[in-house]
Amino acid sequence: KGVSDNMQFIHCAAQDVASHLETPVDLILFHAVLEWVADPRSVLQTLWSVLRPGGVLSLMFYNAHGLLMHNMVAGNFDYVQAGMPKKKKRTLSPDYPRDPAQVYLWLEEGGWQIMGKTGVRVFHDYLREKHQQRDCYEALLELETRYCRQEPYITLGRYIHVTARKPQSKDKV
């Protein structure tokens, strides 16, 4: 049997996930959601409450630094000077791009042990010649993979992926 027999997928508001579970889970995939919620700390607390001790959170969020860098490279100086206000109510641009240091602090304050950080699209979105994203994909992928877990490139990624562990109760300080 494959692992899919041991998997359960729940589609609901993050704040409501506890009401859909009977027992704590081993792994939570929470990708591209944190930047859409007004109260991320309470969402992280909810995720903590449904994860078993020793379980892992896979968290990916839209990076405010990546947004700033993208706009600077594009020459959108006035927009950056204005604080990069969201232009339209209904758009695919997230409502709350997250500062990585703030997210890391929320995780640590919540008791999570950060295991790893990875920048996602640390070079791809900044290429001046957009055709290179396609035409030079193999070389770009190799370089993305080489640098995506090193600073300052982590912090320049358009998204940041964090793996964090909920300690076993005996591990807690």
Residue map of PLM features:
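Conserved SAM-binding strand-loop segment of SAM-dependent methyltransferases
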Residues: 2-16
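Short conserved loop adjoining the S-adenosyl-L-methionine
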Residues: 16-22
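A conserved beta-strand element that flanks and buttresses the S-adenosyl-L-methionine
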Residues: 29
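Short catalytic micro-motifs in class I SAM-dependent methyltransferases
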Residues: 32-33
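A short glycine-rich, Lys/Arg-flanked "PGG" loop and its adjoining helix->strand segment in the class I
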Residues: 41-56
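Conserved class I S-adenosyl-L-methionine
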Residues: 56-83
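Short alpha-helix
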Residues: 92-117
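A C-terminal cap/extension of S-adenosyl-L-methionine-dependent methyltransferases
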Residues: 116-173
